[in-house]
Amino acid sequence: YQTATAFKNVFMLAGTGVFLTIPIAFFLATVINQKFRGLRLFKTFYFMPVVINRIAISLMFTFILYPKMGPVTVLLREFGIRGVNILGNYATAMPAVCLIYMWCDAGFQMIVFSSGLAAIPDEIYEAAQIDGVSSFQKLRYITIPMMKSTFKIVLVFVFTGAFKMFDLVMGLTSGGPGGATEVPNTLLYNNAFTYSRLGYADSIAVVVVLICLAFSFVVNLVFRQR
């Protein structure tokens, strides 16, 4: 049961990365690709979670979501919502971890997408502008096709990054409550170093490696065909 929950959770993290973080990061990359006042501050703000230690981030969010006096709890109390324990509730703990992970990871993907956008020659956009191409058509027929390799890299990073998740979960919930936020690496750690079930821990590690290799192979195959 714990193993199934751990892999379900890690696929939830990967799904959050693919379907939420990547679109948000791509949008932010298009924003920072424009010239406007405060651009450096904007870049610093969104890239900051990437360079901060994730244990420190987990401690920060543990305080923010603290059920007795955390800022979120105090705010909800003002609206008459009491008894909220986001990280201590089986139903809300994993979605909260996913959102925090998304905030941690979006900055790195934003920078990768920004590099991909900067590599597209301005002359192509200028020619499209002369031909009366709309912004959506530029995005669909110029930007996305020319960033195929960038999207491939980001997809692999997002998926394998979810399977590397350990420190954030350990700092926020230690896999609780009741195993609700267990992921393969926390399950591996507990079995290897707490329960001395080294064979079981090794099997989890092998499955994780095989899944990541299989996903990377499929992504490379799909993008090669396109």
Predicted segments with their positions:
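A structural signal for multi-pass alpha-helical bundles of membrane permease subunits
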Residues: 1-226
